[in-house]
Swiss-Prot record:
Taxonomic path: Bacteria, Bacillati, Bacillota, Bacilli, Lactobacillales
Family statement drawn from the similarity comment of this UniProt entry: In the N-terminal section; belongs to the N-acetylglucosamine-1-phosphate uridyltransferase family.
Annotated residues for binding of Mg(2+): D103, N228
Organism this protein belongs to: Limosilactobacillus reuteri (strain DSM 20016) (Lactobacillus reuteri)
Superkingdom field: Bacteria
Quaternary organization: Homotrimer.
Annotated residues for binding of UDP-N-acetyl-alpha-D-glucosamine: 9-12, 23, 73, 78-79, 101-103, 140, 155, 170, 228, 333, 351, 366, 377
Keywords for the protein's UniProt record, in alphabetical order: Acyltransferase, Cell shape, Cell wall biogenesis/degradation, Cytoplasm, Magnesium, Metal-binding, Multifunctional enzyme, Nucleotidyltransferase, Peptidoglycan synthesis, Repeat, Transferase
EC number from the UniProt entry: 2.7.7.23, 2.3.1.157
Name listed for the protein in its UniProt record: Bifunctional protein GlmU
C-alpha cells in the first residue's frame, strides 16, 4: 500500500454562521466539526495529516493538539491557494493525498478507505468523491461521457439545462497522486471573477494532460453534508445523532424514543441499558451494563457503573458505583462519588462528596464537601453546612451513623461511626462512637397562649 496523506481545509471564518466562533469549531453531537473529520481520517490509518488553518488558527490548534501538522493560510485566496500552503510539508512526499473540508463532519473512515482503494486500483491522478443528491441544486455536477468517464465538474451557475438535471454531485472531497497534485497546483491561476485559486482547476489541468481522472460514487449522500450556517448545523446534528443512536442500539442498548435521545459522539454505553426519551448524555460519559436512565435525565462527563438507576436527574462530572440509584429530580455536581447500592432520593444535591456503600439519602438534602461511610441513614431536610462565608469546610460521617431529619451539620465537624444525631439538631461539635447528639432548645408548651394570638 502506498503512503497516504490527508489535508483538512479549516481556514475559513464562516461568516454565514454569524458567530464569534470559527466555523469548524462549532460542535456536532459534542465534538467540533474539524475534530470529527480528523478522527475519521485517523481511523482510516492515514500516515500524514495536515490541517490548513487561517482564522482562529491558535484556537483550532489548541483543539486538535499534536494529532495533526499545521499549515497557515494567511490570506483566504481559494481552496487551491489553501492547498499550496502545504507545499513545504507535503510537496516532496510520495503516495496519495486526500483533501477534505473541516466543515463536513459526517464523512466516515469507511468512505475514506474506499476512496483510497478505488483511486489506487485505477492508478488515477485524481479521483473525485461523488454522490447522488435528491436535490442537486447548488452543487457542482459531475459530467461523464457516453462510456462513463469523467469529463469535467460544472458548477450550478455555469451548467446548461441538461447539465442541471444531473444528480451526481461533487462532494468536495478529492484523492490525488501527491506529486501530480503539486505539479498541477503550480499551473492554476486566479483568472476568474473571484480572483481566487480553485482546487477544482487542478482537475481540468490533469484532464488536459491526459492523466486518469476518475470518480468514486458513494452510497450515502448524507455523509457529504457541509455546514455553512446554523440550519445546516442542526441537520448535521440530527444525522449524527441518528447514527450514534443506531450504533448503540445495535450494540445492545434499548432506547424507548431514539428521536428524543441525545447522545454525544464520545459517550460509551454498556449492554442491556435502557434509556427513556428526553435524555441528554454529553461529553465523555461512560455508562455500564444493565443501567436504567429515566426520562429527562441529563448526564455530563460522568462515570456510571453497572446496574445504576437514574430517574429524571442531573449529573455533572460525577460517579455512581454498581447498584446505586438516584432521583427523581436530584443533582450530582462535580466530584460527587456515590458508592455501591447507595440510594439518593428526590430533591437532593451532592457536591464534592463521597457517599459509602449502602447509605441512604432519602430526600430534600444537601451534601457538600463531605465523606460519608457505609450504611448511614440521612433523614429528610438534612443540610451539610460547608461554607462560612469565606471558605469551604469538610464534614465526616462514620459508618452506621444516623442523621435525623431537619438537622444541620456545621463544618468542620466529625460524626463518629455508630453515633446518632437527633432530628432538628444543629451540630457544631464532633461526636464519639455511640453518642447521641441533641442540639435544639427544649420544647415549652404555654397553656392557653394561642387564644392571645391575632389569628
Amino acid at each position: 500500500m502506498t503512503k497516504r496523506n490527508a489535508i483538512i481545509l479549516a481556514a475559513g471564518k464562516g461568516t454565514r454562521m454569524r458567530s464569534k466562533l470559527y466555523k469548524v469549531l462549532h460542535q456536532v453531537c459534542g465534538k467540533t466539526m474539524v475534530e470529527h473529520v480528523l478522527t475519521q481520517l485517523e481511523k482510516a490509518k492515514i500516515d500524514n495529516i495536515i490541517t490548513i488553518v487561517g482564522f482562529g488558527a491558535e484556537t483550532v490548534e489548541q483543539q486538535l493538539g499534536h494529532r495533526t501538522k499545521y499549515a497557515l493560510q494567511e490570506q483566504q485566496l481559494g481552496t487551491g491557494h489553501a492547498v499550496m500552503q502545504t507545499k513545504d510539508l507535503l510537496a516532496n512526499e510520495d503516495g496519495e493525498t486526500i483533501i477534505v473540508s473541516g466543515d463536513t463532519p459526517l464523512f466516515t473512515a469507511e468512505t475514506f478507505e474506499k476512496l483510497f482503494e478505488y483511486h489506487e486500483q485505477r492508478h488515477a491522478a485524481a479521483t473525485i468523491l461523488t454522490s447522488i443528491a435528491p436535490d442537486p441544486t447548488g452543487y457542482g455536477r459531475i459530467v461523464r461521457n457516453d462510456v462513463g468517464i469523467v469529463e469535467r465538474i460544472v458548477e450550478q451557475k455555469d451548467a446548461t439545462v441538461q447539465e442541471q438535471a444531473i444528480k451526481e454531485i461533487n462532494t468536495g472531497v478529492y484523492c490525488f497522486d501527491n506529486k501530480k497534485l503539486f505539479a498541477a497546483l503550480s499551473k492554476i491561476t486566479n483568472d476568474n471573477a473571484q480572483g481566487e485559486y480553485y482546487l477544482t482547476d487542478v482537475i481540468g489541468i490533469l484532464k488536459q494532460e491526459n492523466e486518469i481522472v476518475t470518480a468514486y460514487k458513494m452510497d450515502n449522500f448524507d455523509e457529504s453534508m457541509g455546514v455553512n450556517d446554523r440550519v445546516a448545523l442542526a441537520r448535521a446534528n440530527k444525522v449524527m445523532r441518528n447514527r450514534i443512536n443506531t450504533h448503540w442500539m445495535r450494540e445492545g442498548v434499548s432506547m424507548i424514543d431514539p428521536e428524543t435521545t441525545y447522545i454525544d459522539a464520545d459517550v460509551k454505553i454498556g449492554r442491556d441499558t435502557v434509556i427513556e426519551g428526553g435524555v441528554v448524555i454529553k461529553g465523555h460519559t461512560e455508562i455500564g451494563n444493565d443501567c436504567y436512565i429515566g426520562a429527562g435525565s441529563r448526564i455530563t462527563d460522568s462515570k456510571i457503573h453497572d446496574g445504576v438507576k437514574i430517574i429524571s436527574s442531573t449529573l455533572q462530572e460525577a460517579e455512581m458505583h454498581n447498584g446505586s440509584d438516584i432521583g427523581p429530580n436530584s443533582h450530582l455536581r462535580p466530584e460527587a462519588e456515590i458508592g455501591e447500592n447507595v440510594h439518593i432520593g428526590n430533591f437532593c444535591e451532592v457536591k464534592k462528596a463521597y457517599i459509602g456503600e449502602g447509605t441512604k439519602v432519602g430526600h430534600l438534602t444537601y451534601i457538600g464537601n463531605a465523606t460519608l461511610g457505609k450504611d448511614i441513614n440521612v433523614g429528610c431536610g438534612v443540610v451539610f453546612v460547608n461554607y462560612d462565608g469565606t471558605n469551604k469546610h469538610h464534614t465526616n460521617v462514620g459508618d452506621h451513623a444516623f442523621i435525623g431529619s431537619n438537622s444541620n451539620l456545621v463544618a468542620p465537624v466529625n460524626i463518629a461511626k455508630d453515633s446518632f444525631v437527633a432530628a432538628g439538631s444543629t451540630i457544631t461539635d464532633s461526636t464519639e462512637q455511640y453518642d447521641m447528639a441533641i442540639a435544639r432548645a427544649r420544647q415549652v408548651n404555654k397553656e392557653n397562649y394561642a387564644k392571645k394570638l391575632p389569628w
